[in-house]
């Protein structure tokens, strides 16, 4: 029956299989997309596509906000109607006064007449008089201004508030969609997209889209309305003059468009460079122990800086273009003034078509239109930047995953037996299409049996497991479960049937209980406890202060390998899976734990299909069927005995391994007494008794970061990720006081020459506004001069001055733009570099702190440095500009009427109050915003960095829910911010109109009662109010300024921190003849963040130069901790670590580490070539290729590398993802060999290797150990038997030491471990 199902399934899907080459299609898709990107690098997201996530509520908010922005935009041109009429009233009044001062003239019956009886020809031009009461006229105009002020207050508030709220809602949705889409992507997509880049896009790029669709939209609508209404009013009042003025508008438009296009292009390049820098930072911070051990800090800073240099270049180019075209636009505007007043005055004086008031109305309305067009350019910049950022975001959102893990499609079988079959499967990884991993693989895995896959590293064993989980689809052939092609099955359902335990298990930064519950959402606490007992994890968990509520730290990195492995096994067992995949699952366990786990596996085997990839014979022998792999093909199949008889691949592996186990020779076993043999049977036979036997004080302190809080109540209900994070008092970013500007400026000292030049330009630009007010009032004053020739002469002089101002502006605006772009980019680069350098210089304990997780640190690097520009970049130009503006305006105003100046100055406190409120409020929000997004960054980083584990246990939805809950915090903050920012903006806008209202009212009084000339009223009011507007504009930058001070404070806090162990500290002892003698003298140690748990409890052991010391003991007894003390990742609390008789605390850190090489159990490789990874072993000099090849040959790596298409130039992928574990381990060994260290540390260095590789690498390591002091940590006894000293550890102390023979003769803990696998206690 089963066979017919298989045949039917093959026939059905075989027809489709010809074209069902998923990964080929993936590669073609990828290639074509890369070609498209090359062809159309300029392709951008359409503007309205930015709003694709808007709901009907958002559309309503944006509509009302736009309507209010439109009404607000009408207000400015509307005021000009009042202003023009008021100008005519002033001029008429002044003309009347001047005429009445002529001897012989008087006002009779509201007409100016000659008082003598002889009629004169001039009487025909008699002027009306006595009708103007200037004070009552001014009261009327003041009330108009006040009414407009109220309207502006209401509309200004609504436009900003509604648009910011609508944007916050859309951005929240966008972040959710983006993360959801990423979590749906197939694993092959992650092979081609780095996690660091995705994190940068999630934080930085979406923020840029937010900037484009929030308040900038409201301001753009307002300004464009003012532009259009201004031009319409100009045409309505006088088309001739309007046409002349707007004849230069196309040039202004060209300038604005050039700014938009250039900024978009340069921003895109800048973003790409920063994203690459983000990838480097993420990779390095995640691998900090490796970087520190190999002294790679300087090299990594240089690698990071290279990417920053590219970003800096594009930023400076952007500043040059911005500066030049801003100057160009201003130059055109001043030339416009000159042309308008020159031509307009002829229409007033010669042709009498316009009144002076009409001229002012036309001129100002068109200029207001043009100025608003100019002011809209920053909005265009934000839109262009947002569209550039949206390109990659929307591309990802729109991409359909080839294997969609959340798809509802596919069959869900009622029953599953667990029969798995590979039919002619050929496969290569999407990122390395030229390397074939599986080659026509055919194999059957029977249900309810344990099948072991054996073979050399890189033969395709782990790849086969990934195909079963459907991380990838075969390029050819198919994989079936119970006769069904797995491509026809529902993915989530399929993965729910599978439990997976990997060699390098990933735990999530939550509690142990929650990590186990990840296996099954509805698991009760009893289920969790039972699973922990089955995985032999219960005892060490109960020894921890918070037991199951213990937080495991980032990636579970605070636990020993064995502890992590057992929690991962518990997580797999709690699923009760029909198919259990064990990829080197017990390699990190000691003999005792492995025996326990094997017993559990044999118990659950009935009704479960177990596939085990393993190198240990003890694991393989227990299997019902063993399949031998070679070159991506299954070459043999059978039981242990059958395959030994066949003398093929398996026989070779067994022979090699048994040769290595000479320690366990017959003599040793014979020496074991009958009691010992009984104990062995007893400990293996009775599970409960063996559990009791294994109760001991394990090292609780491998968890070097645990938060102190009362234990959670144990509950039997579904606990979500978010609740767990909320209940645990995980420390948030500590509060920092905003950095003082003086400190920021002091830090910016190298950029001062540029800032000085930029400030000179900004100061000159600042004088332009009050000088404009002076010249403008001068022109208005000329219209009341009786002599027309005098009028003409003065107007021409003023027009020439406008031309001169335009030319100066062109130069100074360019100067300001370029100089501050240069200083800002240099500062940002330096801040990023110094910040990154300071991070790499911190002690390892600092990275153990949850607040300094890789996600949080990379997010901080990505956003903080660029925000500091807000306090030291173009913002200084804005401050200098505003200061000069106000100073010159005050001088002009007080020179002509100190009384009126004082009245207007009464409104300055309100302006200052508005700005101060904005600054204070937004400083708070900037801080809270950052904290919330850092927490979001931690979730995304954790999910994406461990995507294989997340996909394997089918917890994509759980991370999505966690992220969506966390996103509520920045959303709520944004809503609060919208209301405050809206009110402050509206208040700052309306205060101008109120100031005008009061000023003109009082000005009327001064003209009427004190004889002040009306042009002085215009001069004083224009100068002060325009300078106040500039001040208001400076205040509008308070959000970025506030964020800048908070970000700068974080940087300074980091730069000021003096780590207790600093790699940058040049002090400390160094000596020439480094021998490698090591003495641990009564070392006591607790991890800094967990002072309640003692890890080492008086460790004392000595190693002479050239000797090998092997540490033996149960998982978590402090073996790896001793290595970390030797590397000076930490210092002992009491006692000493002596190196050649020198106290390690007094030895120079760099010098010490340069003499130590390390190979860890989970090797960390960097996303660069194999050659560069090997060269990383010695960062003090350039390593010649000969040395690289020699090291590779010693590590048995050279032949494998030469079989790759790109040989030593082959990129290993993110975290070495393109290589098998054995291959990665051999690269790590070659890296240690190339270092040529005096001390070699091997922490489970061969646990990841198959038997064949282990044998060859062991030979290499034996060679590498010659002439070197060596410390070995291993669970395989064959690895340690030849050590000069074997130190048996328990509870942080050495309980026995000696050679293998001496310890066997003592018949103590070591003897018991070798003969029975019993626990060390």
Swiss-Prot record:
Effect of residue 1186 to K: Impairs taurocholate transport activity; does not affect protein expression; decreases cell surface protein expression; reduces plasma membrane localization
Membrane topology, Extracellular segments: 84-147, 237-240, 341-353, 777-794, 1001-1011
Location of region: Mediates internalization from the plasma membrane: 1311-1314
Membrane topology: Multi-pass membrane protein
Keywords, ordered alphabetically: ATP-binding, Cell membrane, Disease variant, Endosome, Glycoprotein, Intrahepatic cholestasis, Lipid transport, Membrane, Nucleotide-binding, Phosphoprotein, Repeat, Translocase, Transmembrane, Transmembrane helix, Transport, Ubl conjugation
Binding site for ATP 2: 1113-1120
Post-translational modification: N-glycosylated.
Reported impact of residue 982 to R: In PFIC2; impairs taurocholate transport activity; significantly reduces protein expression; decreases cell surface protein expression; loss of ell membrane localization
Tissues where the protein occurs: Expressed predominantly, if not exclusively in the liver, where it was further localized to the canalicular microvilli and to subcanalicular vesicles of the hepatocytes by in situ.
Transmembrane segments: 63-83, 148-168, 216-236, 241-261, 320-340, 354-374, 756-776, 795-815, 870-890, 891-911, 980-1000, 1012-1032
This protein's domain notes: Multifunctional polypeptide with two homologous halves, each containing a hydrophobic membrane-anchoring domain and an ATP binding cassette (ABC) domain.
Name of protein: Bile salt export pump
UniProt source species: Homo sapiens (Human)
Gene that specifies this protein: ABCB11
């Amino acid at each position: 029956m089963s066979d017919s199902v298989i045949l039917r399934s093959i026939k059905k899907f075989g027809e489709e299989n010809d074209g069902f080459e998923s990964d080929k299609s993936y590669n073609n898709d990828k290639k074509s997309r890369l070609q498209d990107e090359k062809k159309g690098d300029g392709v951008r997201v359409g503007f309205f596509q930015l709003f694709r996530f808007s709901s009907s509520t958002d559309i309503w908010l944006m509509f009302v906000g736009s309507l209010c922005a439109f009404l607000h935009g009408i207000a400015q041109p509307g005021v000009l109607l009042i202003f023009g009429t008021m100008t005519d009233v002033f001029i008429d009044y002044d003309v009347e006064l001047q005429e009445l001062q002529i001897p012989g003239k008087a006002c009779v019956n509201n007409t100016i007449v000659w008082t003598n009886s002889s009629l004169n020809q001039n009487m025909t031009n008699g002027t009306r008089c006595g009708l103007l009461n200037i004070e009552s006229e001014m009261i009327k105009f003041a009330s108009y201004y006040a009414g407009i002020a109220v309207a502006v207050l209401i509309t200004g508030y609504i436009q900003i508030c509604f648009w910011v709220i609508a944007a916050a809602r859309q951005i929240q949705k966008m972040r959710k969609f983006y993360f959801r889409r990423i979590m749906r992507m197939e694993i092959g997509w992650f092979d081609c997209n780095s996690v660091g880049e995705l994190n940068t896009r999630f934080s930085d790029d979406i923020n840029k889209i937010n900037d484009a669709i929030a308040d900038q939209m409201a301001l753009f609508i307002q300004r464009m309305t003012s532009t259009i209404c201004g031009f319409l009013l100009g045409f309505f009042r006088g088309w001739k003059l309007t046409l002349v003025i707007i004849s230069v508008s196309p040039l202004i438009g060209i300038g604005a468009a050039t700014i938009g296009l250039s900024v978009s292009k340069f921003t895109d390049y800048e973003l790409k460079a920063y994203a690459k820098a983000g990838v480097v930072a993420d990779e390095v911070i995640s691998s900090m122990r490796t970087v520190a051990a190999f002294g790679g800090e300087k090299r990594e800073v240089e690698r990071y800086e290279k990417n920053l240099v590219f970003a800096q270049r594009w930023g400076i180019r952007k500043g040059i273009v911005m500066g030049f075209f801003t100057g160009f636009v201003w130059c055109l505007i001043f030339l416009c003034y000159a042309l308008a007043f020159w031509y307009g005055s002829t229409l007033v004086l010669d042709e009498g078509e316009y009144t002076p008031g009409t001229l002012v109305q036309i001129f100002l309305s068109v200029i207001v239109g043009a100025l608003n067009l100019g002011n809209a350019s920053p909005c265009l910049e934000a839109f262009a930047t947002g569209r550039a950022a949206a390109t990659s975001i929307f591309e990802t959102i729109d991409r359909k995953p080839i294997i969609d893990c959340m798809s509802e499609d596919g069959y869900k079988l009622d029953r599953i037996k667990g029969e798995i079959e590979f039919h002619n499967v050929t496969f290569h990884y999407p990122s390395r299409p030229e390397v074939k991993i599986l080659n026509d693989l055919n194999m059957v895995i029977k249900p309810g049996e344990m099948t072991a896959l054996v073979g050399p590293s890189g033969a395709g064993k782990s790849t086969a497991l990934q195909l079963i989980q459907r991380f990838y689809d075969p390029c050819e052939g198919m994989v079936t479960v119970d006769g069904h092609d797995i491509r026809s099955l529902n993915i989530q359902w399929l993965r729910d049937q599978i439990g997976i335990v990997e060699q390098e298990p990933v735990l999530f930064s939550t509690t142990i209980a929650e990590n186990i519950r990840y296996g099954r959402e509805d698991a009760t606490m009893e289920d969790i406890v039972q699973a922990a007992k089955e995985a032999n994890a219960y005892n060490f968990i109960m020894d921890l202060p918070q037991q199951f509520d213990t937080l495991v730290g980032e990636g579970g990195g605070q636990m020993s390998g064995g502890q992590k492995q057992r929690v991962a096994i518990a997580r797999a067992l709690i699923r009760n899976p029909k198919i259990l995949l064990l990829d080197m699952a017990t390699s990190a366990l000691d003999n005792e734990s492995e025996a326990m786990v094997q017993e559990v596996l044999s118990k659950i085997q009935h009704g479960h299909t177990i596939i085990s990839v393993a190198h240990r014979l003890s694991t393989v022998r227990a299997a019902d069927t063993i399949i031998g792999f070679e070159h991506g093909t299954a070459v043999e199949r059978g039981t242990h005995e059958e395959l030994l008889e066949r003398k093929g691949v398996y026989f070779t592996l067994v022979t090699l391994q048994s040769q290595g186990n000479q320690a366990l020779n017959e003599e040793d076993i014979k020496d074991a007494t009958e009691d010992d043999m009984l104990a062995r049977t007893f400990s293996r036979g009775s599970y409960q008794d063996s559990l009791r036997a294994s109760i001991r004080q394990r090292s609780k302190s491998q968890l070097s970061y645990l938060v102190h809080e009362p234990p959670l109540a144990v509950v039997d209900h579904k606990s979500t990720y978010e609740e767990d994070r909320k209940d645990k008092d995980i420390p948030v970013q500590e509060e920092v006081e905003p950095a003082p500007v003086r400190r920021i400026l002091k830090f910016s000292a190298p950029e001062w020459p540029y800032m000085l030049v930029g400030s000179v330009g900004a100061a000159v630009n600042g004088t332009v506004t009050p000088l404009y007010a002076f010249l403008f009032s001068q022109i208005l004053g000329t219209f009341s001069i009786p002599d027309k020739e005098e009028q003409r002469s003065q107007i021409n002089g003023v027009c020439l001055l406008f031309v001169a101002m335009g030319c100066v502006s062109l130069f100074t605006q360019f100067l300001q733009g370029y100089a501050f772009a240069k200083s800002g980019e240099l500062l940002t680069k330096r801040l990023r570099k110094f910040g990154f350098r300071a991070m790499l210089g911190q002690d390892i304990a600092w990275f153990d702190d949850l607040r300094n997780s890789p996600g949080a640190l990379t997010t901080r690097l990505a956003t903080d440095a660029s925000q500091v520009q807000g306090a030291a970049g173009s913002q200084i130009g804005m401050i200098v500009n505003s200061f000069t503006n106000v100073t010159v305006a005050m001088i002009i105003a007080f020179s002509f009427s100190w009384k009126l100046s004082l009245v207007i100055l009464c409104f300055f406190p309100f302006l200052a109050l508005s700005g101060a409120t904005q600054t204070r409020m937004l400083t708070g929000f900037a801080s809270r915003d950052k904290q919330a997004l850092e927490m979001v960054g931690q979730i995304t980083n954790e999910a994406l960095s461990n995507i294989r584990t997340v996909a394997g246990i089918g917890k994509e939805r759980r991370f999505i829910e966690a992220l969506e809950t966390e996103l509520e915090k920045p959303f709520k903050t944004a809503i609060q911010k919208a209301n405050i920012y809206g009110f402050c903006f509206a208040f700052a806008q309306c205060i101008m109109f109120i100031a005008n209202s009061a000023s003109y009212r009082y000005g009327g009084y001064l003209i009427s009662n004190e004889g002040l000339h009306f042009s002085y009223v215009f001069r004083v009011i224009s100068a002060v109010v325009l300078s106040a507007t500039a001040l208001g504009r400076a205040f509008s930058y308070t959000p970025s300024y506030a964020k800048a001070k908070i970000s700068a404070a974080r940087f300074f806090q980091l730069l000021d921190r003096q780590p207790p162990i600093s790699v940058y500290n040049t002090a400390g002892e160094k000596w020439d003849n480094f021998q490698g003698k090591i003495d641990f003298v009564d070392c006591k140690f607790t991890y800094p963040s967990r002072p309640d748990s003692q890890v080492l409890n008086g460790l004392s052991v000595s190693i002479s130069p050239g000797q090998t010391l092997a540490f033996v003991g149960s998982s978590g007894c402090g073996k790896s901790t001793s290595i970390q003390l030797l590397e000076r990742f930490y210092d002992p609390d009491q006692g000493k670590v002596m190196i050649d008789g020198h106290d390690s605390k007094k030895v120079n850190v760099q010098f010490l580490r340069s003499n130590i090489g390390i190979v860890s159990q989970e090797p960390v490789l960097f996303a660069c070539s194999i050659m560069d990874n090997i060269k990383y072993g010695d960062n003090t000099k350039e390593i010649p290729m000969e040395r690289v090849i020699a090291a590779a040959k010693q590590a048995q790596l050279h032949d494998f590398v030469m079989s790759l298409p790109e040989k030593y130039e082959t990129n290993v992928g993110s975290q070495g993802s393109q290589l098998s574990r054995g291959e990665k381990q051999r690269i790590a060994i070659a890296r240690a060999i190339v270092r040529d260290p005096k001390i070699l540390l091997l922490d489970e260095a061969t646990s990841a290797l198959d038997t064949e590789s282990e044998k060859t690498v062991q030979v290499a390591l034996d060679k590498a150990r010659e002439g070197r002091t060596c410390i070995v940590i291993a669970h395989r006894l064959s690895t340690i038997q030849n050590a000069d000293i074997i130190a048996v550890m328990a509870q942080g102390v050495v309980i026995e030491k000696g050679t293998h023979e001496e310890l066997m003769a003592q018949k103590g803990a070591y003897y018991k471990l070798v003969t029975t696998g019993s626990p060390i206690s």
